[in-house]
């Protein structure tokens, strides 16, 4: 039987598992400073991750945000614990970190898991690979104790990266996937599912508050919701299918004119994506409407446009979610401003979008596995 939403979702901070997040400088800014951005973006256009394999408490975990739009937090793996900085990602489902056996140049600049130093480690003969927009990793499935704040998952399956290609300038060690599990004979159980199954969290929900602050204030919470992080009421949106954090969008408009998604479209809410991604033709139309100019794989615009351009409104389940110009116009390290709209390079049979951190900073988001839906409300 579905659990009672009104009692289960609203909780007070003393009953919460809160995990702090940090906002880290994106690969884009790192590469811009090294004059490497254009080459990398041509080689690795945005696409969703593709993966192949051969209690009653609410935990709120802080995340960190450094200068741009990736939000990372700390976890530990092993006994004694080894600490890693990971991206909490609703667009993928696997937890992985680099192995000490990985000799790729990308692995060498990150914290690597030393399996021989953990008394609770065990390996398997299962291998896998994951392709993200920015690169590919290959690894093996292993098991060990994983801790997210006060949450503990014993004998948790996770990936150990043995080789990494791409990922230039990555500012986090690994990824903690929070999407639905993918059906495969060899795929490890996602950590959220294992925590849920072993009763470590009382309700099958997690939520994100992504602060606009450059460093502190962002959190991911497990097992319920702290209502102090949002204003008003949560508006619930059913998932398109109970296997992915994708919802239906009614339309996208500006100045009361529909500019995209005229017949409805799908949108993935992806904490692992920095921007708002959509079909190339429609993104180009939006860039023209707001007056941006393409240059070096970005669309630049006058910084003063934040004071004159209207909001772009995503209507979801009958509710309007404005994205103001102050959110979709970003200032780079050189002082020039550019837009937060990006074209998806992988074509799909239907119109689909990705609502990344530009959208999620504006709206507190609750991911409800118990009822296969997402809750949205204006963030505090």
From Swiss-Prot:
The lineage of its organism: Eukaryota, Metazoa, Chordata, Craniata, Vertebrata. Pfam families: A1_Propeptide (PF07966), Asp (PF00026). Glycans are attached at residues 74, 125. It comes from the Eukaryota. Residues 1-15 form the signal peptide. InterPro entries: Aspartic_peptidase_A1, Aspartic_peptidase_AS, Aspartic_peptidase_N, PEPTIDASE_A1, Peptidase_aspartic_dom_sf. GO terms for biological process: proteolysis. Disulfide bonds join 102-107, 261-265, 303-337. Keywords: Aspartyl protease, Disulfide bond, Glycoprotein, Hydrolase, Protease, Secreted, Signal. Trophoblast and placental tissue. Produced specifically in the invasive binucleate cells of the placenta. It comes from Ovis aries (Sheep). This is Pregnancy-associated glycoprotein 4. Its EC number is 3.4.23.-.
């Amino acid at each position: 039987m579905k659990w009672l939403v009104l009692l289960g979702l609203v909780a007070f901070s003393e009953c919460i598992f809160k995990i702090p997040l940090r906002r880290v400088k994106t690969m884009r800014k790192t590469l811009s400073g090294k004059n490497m951005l254009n080459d990398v973006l041509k080689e690795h256009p945005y696409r969703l991750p593709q993966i192949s394999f051969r209690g009653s408490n609410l935990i709120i975990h802080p995340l960190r945000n450094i200068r741009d739009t990736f939000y990372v937090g700390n976890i530990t793996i092993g006994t004694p614990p080894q600490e890693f900085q990971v991206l909490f990602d609703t667009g993928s489902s696997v937890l992985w970190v680099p192995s000490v056996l990985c000799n790729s140049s990308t692995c060498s600049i990150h914290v690597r898991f030393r399996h021989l130093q953990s008394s609770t480690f065990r390996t398997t003969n299962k291998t896998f690979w994951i392709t993200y927009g920015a690169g590919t990793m290959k690894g093996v499935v292993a098991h060990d104790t994983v801790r997210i704040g006060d949450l503990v998952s014993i004998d948790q399956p996770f990936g150990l990266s043995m080789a990494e290609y791409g990922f230039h300038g990555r500012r986090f060690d690994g990824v903690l996937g929070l999407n639905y599990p993918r059906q495969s004979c060899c795929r490890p159980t996602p950590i959220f599912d294992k925590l849920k199954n072993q009763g470590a969290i009382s309700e099958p929900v997690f939520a994100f508050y992504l602060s606009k602050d450059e460093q502190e204030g962002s959190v991911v919470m497990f097992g319920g919701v702290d209502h102090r992080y949002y204003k008003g009421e949560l508006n619930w949106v059913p998932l398109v299918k109970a296997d992915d954090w994708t919802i239906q969008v009614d339309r996208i408009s500006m100045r009361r004119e529909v500019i995209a998604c005229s017949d409805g479209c799908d949108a993935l809410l992806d904490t692992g994506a920095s921007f708002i991604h959509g079909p190339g033709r429609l993104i180009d139309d939006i860039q023209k409407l707001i007056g941006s100019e393409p240059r070096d794989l970005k669309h630049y615009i006058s910084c003063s446009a934040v004071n004159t351009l209207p909001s772009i409104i995503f209507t979801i389940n009958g509710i309007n979610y404005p994205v103001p110009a102050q959110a979709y116009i970003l200032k780079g390290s050189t002082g020039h401003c550019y837009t937060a709209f990006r074209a998806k390079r992988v074509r799909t049979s239907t119109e689909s979008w990705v609502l990344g951190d530009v959208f999620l900073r504006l709206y507190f988001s609750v991911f409800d596995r118990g009822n296969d839906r997402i809750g949205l409300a204006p963030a505090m």
